[in-house]
């Protein structure tokens, strides 16, 4: 066996090295300055400790703090330092798990007295002390017996349970930072000093061990960490901005919706919120109609036999709401379920009546109410609910039509997002997972088509980012995922396009081909908004409640300065309504500044102020939300201007094209 390995560097050069050489020694052999900046290295994309030997040939990269991959290491190491700090400050506290998550990390602790926000500054101070010590991260591999014995002797019962859960034959890695150690898969940076000081503990929360309500309640401390202070401060500023834009707060202030205990995870829509919801549905309905979709509606309650056939009963039963009818006055003892998805119902509509290849593609769309169980702790306003409306569509087509249909879907999705002001879009292709249905040949064909489509999208749209998510596809086929970036830089995964060869086969769906033989259609699942409720939540936060005029539930308030203008205000409001605008009249005996402030808090886009002079001259004083400017104009001019601005973008395009 050779003791040398062949390494290819990012510049394409290839060199031979001793297989026992460590990543740290490799970095130093390139340059001393690189060795000082190195925090880890990677071979064929797998990140390793600098202390690990090279071991095998491959493509090698030295990772520094500036590398995006270093951020996960920084956060991972900070979580370990958090755990050490807690155990130094609060002896007897048990540590459990501390993973890296999106935008940060957390660590769960078992302690008789839960931590509070007041504890965080003290813990942070201790963490900075530990980082200052600059202790090296060192790795040992222990036997299962040793690990269980050591953790048991320390009173770390949760760690013992974690050791028991590690599959036989898998290494049990222990990472030290000075004298403190933890069970961990790694990798880590070279020392605690490489973490830096750009971190912050954010909040505390309760969390059940392993997410099971039957297990003990732990205290979870959340934190975040970045490579530098600028990135940390930018993130904290974004969080402040996000708090101001929180759709739950704005929903209360704007009187859009509410939730209550008797209906956890389902929305009580108020008049203005429901108007906004209907605006979204009306817009989407027009877009679908112009793209050849047929709108349908399928039952919300269906016998479990249908869900067994579809596979949802086996794959998704724990997340479904079951319905049984019991009592002396009924002989119906069947089990039903509220639909969690619309797709099986659409297959039933496709199957109703004989279909020819000449009929394809058939595009069925539904604004379908679906219900999915979510743990109460996961519910979050409109963003995470149990009952919601899915803007589902399913295209039944031939395999030859699949690429063209995916491209048409993409054009529609991007156009919708652009109409709502989202310009930065990322599209990622999720490929076959380990557990899947269908032959490899079928997956090869489907993935090949979607890769071709993705490349065409990339060539046509310069501002669209694309990528691949290996192994992240649905069990029945590959899919595209569409992610939006909002006004404050957050990303939201919304639209999907999924190819499905499985469901038509399960239900025996077919069409008659050109050769007069039965053939199975390809089924393309497509969602643009996804959950309409969630999409509205995203819009509210993106616009900070200041919705575009065409989408606002109340577009104009006509407010009087004195009662002398009441009749004129009523006349003006009537004309505005006749022109198709959503108008409210405010004739209250209040000061005009009070009225303007109140309606501004309600995020009404336009306020038309009418006083005695305006009544005499048939004018209005226009004030825009967020602006101190005032503009005087005739009522007719105001109506013309507002009607143009209040025209939805799809209708405006038709008007301009005509």
From Swiss-Prot:
Binds 1 zinc ion per subunit. Residues 1-64 form the TGS domain. It comes from the Bacteria. Keywords: Aminoacyl-tRNA synthetase, ATP-binding, Cytoplasm, Ligase, Metal-binding, Nucleotide-binding, Protein biosynthesis, RNA-binding, tRNA-binding, Zinc. It holds the Pfam family tRNA-synt_2b. Its EC number is 6.1.1.3. Disulfide bonds: none annotated. InterPro entries: aa-tRNA-synt_IIb, aa-tRNA-synth_II, aa-tRNA-synth_II/BPL/LPL, Anticodon-bd, Anticodon-bd_dom_sf, Beta-grasp_dom_sf, TGS, TGS-like. Residues 246-548 are annotated as: Catalytic. Gene3D superfamilies: 3.10.20.30, 3.30.54.20, Anticodon-binding domain, Bira Bifunctional Protein, Domain 2, Threonyl-trna Synthetase, Chain A, domain 2. Zn(2+) binds at residues 343, 394, 525. One of its GO terms (biological process) is threonyl-tRNA aminoacylation. It catalyses: tRNA(Thr) + L-threonine + ATP = L-threonyl-tRNA(Thr) + AMP + diphosphate + H(+). It is found in: Cytoplasm. GO terms for cellular component: cytosol. The keyword Ion transport does not apply. The keyword Ribosomal protein does not apply. Catalyzes the attachment of threonine to tRNA(Thr) in a two-step reaction: L-threonine is first activated by ATP to form Thr-AMP and then transferred to the acceptor end of tRNA(Thr). Also edits incorrectly charged L-seryl-tRNA(Thr). Belongs to the class-II aminoacyl-tRNA synthetase family. Homodimer. HAMAP family: Thr_tRNA_synth. This is Threonine--tRNA ligase. It comes from Brucella melitensis biotype 1 (strain ATCC 23456 / CCUG 17765 / NCTC 10094 / 16M). The lineage of its organism: Bacteria, Pseudomonadati, Pseudomonadota, Alphaproteobacteria, Hyphomicrobiales.
